[in-house]
Swiss-Prot record:
Forms a cylinder of 14 subunits composed of two heptameric rings stacked back-to-back. Interacts with the co-chaperonin GroES. ATP binds at residues 29-32, 86-90, 413, 476-478, 492. It is found in: Cytoplasm. GO terms for molecular function: ATP binding; ATP-dependent protein folding chaperone; isomerase activity; unfolded protein binding. Keywords: ATP-binding, Chaperone, Cytoplasm, Isomerase, Nucleotide-binding. InterPro entries: Chaperonin_Cpn60_CS (IPR018370), Cpn60/GroEL (IPR001844), Cpn60/GroEL/TCP-1 (IPR002423), GroEL-like_apical_dom_sf (IPR027409), GROEL-like_equatorial_sf (IPR027413), TCP-1-like_intermed_sf (IPR027410). One of its GO terms (cellular component) is cytoplasm. Its EC number is 5.6.1.7. This is Chaperonin GroEL. It comes from Streptococcus pyogenes serotype M3 (strain ATCC BAA-595 / MGAS315). It comes from the Bacteria. Its main location: cytoplasm. It holds the Pfam family Cpn60_TCP1. It catalyses: ATP + H2O + a folded polypeptide = ADP + phosphate + an unfolded polypeptide.
């Protein structure tokens, strides 16, 4: 395929146009008075959202060079979302600010490599300063406060803090759609392990790329499943019940995997295969945990069992199983309460005798998975559009809350970024490195400027007053008042803020050091088919 190539200033200018189109769309959502963005969907009603990463992923530009700039910023939002689960709009605003300030200096003749070095040094200093002013989050009330700020709903904050109290900070919390209009919290027994489906063709929901199995059977084995004939009699028995099947095995390969996938695609029966969690002796123990939780038996040579001899009585059962590309969640296993209690007691006794910190950590993980359960927040709303928007907000809030528990909190509303300016400004750098530092200093102001602008205030005035205010005091854009941010509950998780800054600085630096951009040349439109010989155009009925 032929390529289009742009160089130097032309290349950077084209990419920056794409950066601006995406960032200008996303940044209107920032802050307590941020607006919504309406996204057209190929099917169904439009999606109304203020979630930065959701908006960024939807944007495709016609110009290939501009689209590359937009996609790089979208990558910043996605990466921040993957690491911290929130802060995607802040990351986008920071990226745009660093790119714009950097481009001015590069155009004026500054060395992009020196600027990049200065940006990296200043960013590292800002991150350390953020960690130094972080306050730990503990207690139900503090957790509820973090969740309420992220979701813009005190009720959601209460649900998330209640869920984390019930299943632990590292417990499994899922978000589902409610059948009614009310949002409610439900805690059910369950287990999660870090293994996803072996083929994406096994998913049942193509939009979310997850496989949901209702009332499934579970085959648990530490063997490889390579020959489909080994499990064919068992598959035929499961097929008669018209219920789905989850296969947990050392691996599923050879002819077995394509055969299972083909039957899934044809709709013969619903089957999902995942690899067994853990390794070595720990894998055997975890498979036994799953078997006890689900009322099944591990098909293993240790018990003298072969796959070809497995019967329906060896299969575990559960009310529901959800599998995505990275993890499997088993909800309401059919194992007996007595067997589960005995297993928990055994693990606790092993905890008392182990001398290895690593073994202790893994035993505690197994204990939490067996006894902790799964919290389900069932989201209700009057319309489908409102339901989707609410789900996105709760997902962001849950991620932000976990990030806050992990690394602590700082004053929100961009205040913490203004606070660390003093530390960054104190860096003694020279030449283009100093220019890079100054670019970061200007970018650190941008989230506050945008929050103020979205709320109808002049950003520069707010920033000047903020720089001269006592530590911890900030601007509440929702009310227009100057308050103690943390006491008022306007807070941001450190992990969210630092991830946004680190990812923004990384990608913005790459854009500034770009000297050539290569894009695919658009394919020429195919010529219209020739009219048959001897045919009179007037015979076409005037169309």
């Amino acid at each position: 395929m032929a390529k289009d190539i742009k160089f130097s200033a032309d290349a950077r200018a084209a990419m920056v146009r794409g950066v601006d189109m995406l960032a200008d769309t996303v940044k209107v959502t920032l802050g307590p008075k941020g607006r919504n963005v309406v996204l057209e969907k190929a099917f169904g009603s439009p999606l109304i959202t203020n979630d930065g990463v959701t908006i960024a992923k939807e944007i495709e530009l016609e110009d290939h060079f501009e689209n590359m700039g937009a996609k790089l910023v979208s990558e910043v939002a996605s990466k921040t979302n993957d690491i911290a689960g929130d802060g995607t709009t802040t990351a986008t605003v920071l990226t745009q600010a660093i790119v714009h300030e950097g481009l001015k200096n590069v155009t004026a003749g500054a060395n992009p490599i020196g600027i990049r070095r200065g940006i990296e040094t200043a960013t590292a200093t800002a991150v350390e300063a953020l960690k130094a002013i972080a306050q730990p989050v503990s207690g139900k009330e503090a957790i509820a406060q973090v969740a309420a700020v992220s979701s813009r709903s005190e009720k959601v904050g209460e649900y998330i803090s209640e869920a984390m109290e019930r299943v632990g900070n590292d417990g499994v919390i899922t978000i589902e759609e409610s059948r009614g209009m009310e949002t409610e919290l439900e805690v059910v027994e369950g287990m999660q392990f870090d293994r996803g489906y072996l083929s994406q063709y096994m998913v049942t929901d193509n939009e979310k790329m997850v496989a949901d199995l209702e009332n499934p059977f579970i085959l648990i084995t530490d063997k490889k499943v390579s020959n489909i004939q080994d499990i064919l009699p068992l598959l035929e028995e499961v097929l008669k019940t018209n219920r789905p099947l989850l296969i947990i095995a050392d691996d599923v390969d050879g002819e077995a995997l394509p055969t299972l996938v083909l039957n899934k695609i044809r709709g013969t029966f619903n089957v999902v295969a995942v690899k067994a969690p853990g390794f070595g002796d720990r894998r055997k123990a975890m498979l036994e945990d799953i078997a006890i939780l689900t009322g099944g038996t591990v098909i293993t040579e240790d018990l003298g069992l072969e796959l070809k001899d497995a019967t329906m009585t060896a299969l575990g059962q559960a009310a529901k199983i959800t599998v995505d590309k990275d993890s499997t969640v088993i909800v309401e296993g059919s194992g007996s309460s007595e067997a589960i209690a005995n297993r928990i007691a055994l693990i606790k006794s092993q905890l008392e005798t182990t001398t290895s910190d690593f073994d202790r950590e893994k035993l505690q993980e197994r204990l939490a998975k067996l006894g902790g359960g799964v919290a389900v927040i069932k989201v209700g709303a009057p319309t489908e559009t409102a339901l989707k928007e609410m789900k996105l907000r709760i997902e962001d809030a849950l991620n932000a809350t976990r990030a806050a528990v992990e690394e602590g909190i700082v004053a929100g509303g961009g205040t913490a970024l203004i606070t660390v300016i003093e530390k960054v400004a104190a860096l003694e750098l020279e030449g283009d490195d100093a220019t890079g530092r100054n670019i970061v200093l200007r970018a650190l102001e941008e989230p506050v400027r945008q929050i103020a602008l979205n709320a109808g205030y002049e950003g520069s005035v707010v920033i000047d007053k903020l720089k001269n205010s006592p530590a911890g005091t900030g601007f509440n854009a929702a009310t227009g008042e100057w308050v103690d941010m943390i006491k008022t509950g306007i807070i941001d998780p450190v992990k969210v803020t630092r991830s946004a800054l680190q990812n923004a600085a990384s990608v913005a630096s790459l854009i500034l050091t770009t000297e050539a951009v290569v894009a695919n040349k658009p394919e020429p439109a195919a010529p219209a088919p020739a009219m048959p010989a001897g045919m009179d155009p007037g015979m076409m009925g005037g169309f």
